[in-house]
From Swiss-Prot:
Belongs to the TACO1 family. HAMAP family: Transcrip_reg_TACO1. Coiled coil: none annotated. One of its GO terms (molecular function) is DNA binding. It is found in: Cytoplasm. It comes from Synechococcus sp. (strain CC9311). One of its GO terms (cellular component) is cytosol. This is Probable transcriptional regulatory protein sync_2234.
Length: 244
């Protein structure tokens, strides 16, 4: 019986992992589809090149990428009706939450996002209620903790804003929203190993929650929003929670 129980747990775990992987692939495909509206050639479409690189890093099969490009560029089928939608709201203790989604049905997505907020002590707000608490920035991740002097020299040339040594051993470079292509291409051309790049919503200031129960509720809200099929990204101003 114990063996059967263990096997059942393995199957359940695999189903959860497969489900999350499938949802991720769906979101990545949608990002490619939207980017491909501006042209099917990634060499001349930076947004598409970014989406493809992100998808390949996550293991999205080449066939899925090709179909997403064809759908977005209108090759052989009806053009995609996906649109980018931003939602803003509050979590426990007034934590600011900014959600970006790609959807072909605004009503469905809004209902799902609203339900996730209400189930986890939050509230969906009006457009603009928390976006002023974030900066929309570019970020480029480099391999390893880079040598400071040559990196600083290159970042000054490229007009980057800052860099941060990450806990995973990489180096994250930040810049203005419009600087993404310049930073990515410039760092690559100067010999740095670029792992990935994209845009992010960076909180102007972080909010600390001392109560571990409330902090956990905030995390569950973020996880619930991230699990929605239409959601691409979830940003909050919650300070990192130190594990005991």
């Amino acid at each position: 019986m114990a063996g059967h129980s263990k096997w059942s747990q393995i199957k359940r775990t695999k189903a959860v992992v497969d489900g999350k992987r499938g949802a991720l692939f769906t979101r990545l495909g949608r990002e490619i589809t939207v980017a491909a509206r501006n042209g099917a050639d990634p060499n001349g479409n930076f947004q598409l090149r970014t989406a493809i690189t992100k998808a390949r890093s996550a293991g999205l099969p080449a066939g899925n990428i090709e179909r997403a490009i064809a759908k977005g560029s209108g090759q052989g089928e009806t053009a995609s009706s996906l649109e980018l939608i931003r939602y803003e709201g509050y979590g426990p203790e007034g934590m600011a939450v900014l959600v970006e989604a790609l959807s072909d049905n605004r009503n469905r997505t809004a209902a799902e996002v609203r339900l996730a907020f209400s189930k986890h002590g939050g509230k969906l707000g009006e457009t603009g209620c928390v976006s002023y608490l974030f900066q929309h920035r570019s970020e480029v991740r480099l391999e390893g903790h880079c040598e400071e002097e040559p990196l600083l020299e290159n970042l000054l040339e490229l007009e980057a804003e800052e860099y941060v040594l990450q806990s995973d051993g990489s180096t994250m470079v930040h810049g203005g929203f419009e600087a993404l292509e310049q930073l990515q291409q410039g760092l690559h051309d100067r010999g740095w190993r670029v792992l990935n790049w994209g845009h992010c919503w960076h909180p102007v200031a972080l909010m600390e929650i001392q109560d571990p129960h409330l902090a956990e509720t905030c995390q569950r809200l973020q996880e619930a929003l991230e699990s929605l099929d239409d959601v691409c990204s979830v940003s909050t101003n919650l300070a990192p929670i130190e594990q005991a």
